[in-house]
Each structure stands twice: as C-alpha cells, then as structure tokens.
Regions:
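Ser/Thr-rich, low-complexity intrinsically disordered terminal regions
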Residues: 18-191
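Bacterial Sec-dependent N-terminal signal peptides
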Residues: 1-22
Length: 191
C-alpha cells in the first residue's frame, strides 16, 4: 500500500510539472519563457553556404512590413548570425459597416545557427511594442493563462480576447518570418 501511495504521488508530481498549451494557441511557452525554434534540413548544403545566406537575409531590406533589422553578431566560427528585429503587421477588423485597422508591433532577437545540411532559427526575447513601451510577451502570457486583462505601464488595457489576438498575430509573424528565411536559405549565391 505504501508503494502504491508513493507511486501515485510521483505520477501526480510529474503531471503537475508537465508543460501544457493552457491557452490553446500553440505558443512555445516553457520555463517561463517564449522561444520559437525550428530546425530545417537542407540536403547537400554546406555550412558556409547556409551561413552566408543567413547573413545576406539579415543584411537585405525585407519586402514586407519590417520596420528595422539590426545585425548584432556574425560569427563564422560558430556559423551564427544574430539580429534584432522590429516587425509590424497590420490587420483589418470589420466593425459594423466600416473596417478598422490595427497595427501590431513586436521586437525580438533572431538567431540563425548553421551546420552542414541544416540550420536552426530561434526567435526569443520577444517584446510587445506600444508607443514607447516595450513589454515582454511573457507578462502578457501570464495574464492570458490567468484569464485576466493586462494593463500596460502607459494605462492601455488588453482584455483576454485582445491578448488571444496578440498571440495569434505573433504566431502569424513568426510563421511569415520563418517562411521568408527558408526561401532565402536554399538559394545558391555562389559566384
């Protein structure tokens, strides 16, 4: 009986620490941090080619609504490029007979690590940008998990539905970004 109780306690404790998608939005929230990560295989691609393409991607002007990209690190030994990205996305919402446009701006760190035949994209240190206020999205996630609204330092309020929309938009931004990087990484830019 004692062993059965210990086993039940261990199972309960293990399930209490399991990471679940408590908000149903497929947000990679673990260890109190939101980090998007994707590893992409590219057959017959040399590490140097992938590294060069990653650097070119960060150096180019993007054709969509990115306001600013700043290259922060380009390390050929690690085959790593890191940049700070400010990304804006405008969405339309129908309201009676008119259309309202909301612009969502976020700032994040983008890291691309390259190896032979594959590369990894990491998006982290994500901040919600409002006027001059930068708010870590983890704070917004805690409010969403608790089903509470979030009040910004400047007095603006996001209700639970608004928080859900912010994270849906963040997923769209990350998806668009990863798709664009993937297109650039497979191009042969050799002379």
């Amino acid at each position: 009986m004692k062993k059965l109780l210990i086993l039940a306690f261990i199972i309960f404790a293990k399930s209490a620490f399991a990471q679940k998608d408590t908000v149903g939005l497929n947000i990679p929230f673990a260890n109190n941090t939101i980090v998007y990560e994707k590893v992409v295989g590219v057959p017959n691609a040399a590490k140097n080619t992938l590294f060069g393409n990653a650097g070119l991607w960060l150096a180019e002007t993007r054709p969509y609504n990115i306001a600013d990209i700043q290259l922060q690190l380009e390390d050929p030994v690690l085959s790593r490029v890191v940049g700070k990205v400010n990304y804006s996305l405008t969405e339309s919402n129908k309201f009676f007979l008119s259309t309202l446009y909301d612009t969502y701006i976020c700032s994040f760190t983008l890291q691309i690590d390259c190896k032979d035949n594959k590369y990894r994209i990491r998006i982290y240190n994500i901040q919600d940008v409002g006027n001059t206020t930068y708010t870590p999205v983890e704070k917004l996630m805690y409010a969403l998990i608790d089903s509470k609204s979030y009040t910004f330092a400047d007095g603006g309020i996001l209700k639970v539905a608004d928080l859900q929309n912010r994270f849906k938009t963040l997923n769209t931004i990350v998806s668009n970004l990863i798709t664009d990087i993937t297109k650039s990484m497979t191009v042969d830019n050799s002379f």
